[in-house]
């Protein structure tokens, strides 16, 4: 199987940009680049093997959604068809108190 076409929805793209910006402001440019490169590398892997994620029961709708840990603190939420991988959201996995 080849790679699926990748579509990053606006909501997910915004989350990637805002999180990268946070890393740059609060840590440094190296950390920001490492985060962003890690997310996009994981998206590339998912485009070749979309079934490696687990079903994400928190997402409701007409589609089956999956999530995959892309970074120690973030999951990629996605769905896919025979030809396209849709990146739906980037979700923080940190526990809130």
Language model segments and positions:
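A short hydrophobic/aromatic micro-motif that marks alpha-helical segments and, especially, helix-coil
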Residues: 43-44, 88
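A short, surface-exposed loop/turn module that caps and links secondary-structure elements
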Residues: 44-70
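Generic alpha-helical hydrophobic packing signal
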Residues: 7, 50, 66, 81-83
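Arg/Lys-rich, positively charged N-terminal/basic patches that mediate binding to nucleic acids
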Residues: 1-38
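Enriched for short, Lys/Arg-rich terminal
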Residues: 70-75, 79-97
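Conserved catalytic core of Hanks-type protein kinase domains
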Residues: 12, 45-46, 79
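Alpha-helical transmembrane segments and membrane-interface helix-loop junctions
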Residues: 5-10, 20-21, 40, 49-56, ...
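Residue-level signal for beta-strand positions within conserved beta-sheet cores that form or flank
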Residues: 2, 64, 83-86
């Amino acid at each position: 199987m080849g790679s699926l076409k990748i579509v990053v929805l606006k909501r997910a793209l915004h989350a990637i940009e805002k999180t990268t910006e946070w890393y740059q402001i609060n840590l440094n440019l190296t950390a920001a680049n490492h985060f962003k490169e890690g997310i996009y590398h994981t998206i590339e892997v998912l485009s070749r093997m979309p079934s490696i994620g687990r079903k994400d029961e928190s997402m409701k709708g007409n589609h089956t959604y999956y999530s995959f840990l892309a970074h120690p603190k973030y999951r990629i939420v996605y769905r896919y068809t025979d030809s396209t991988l849709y990146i739906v959201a980037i979700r923080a996995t940190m526990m809130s108190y």
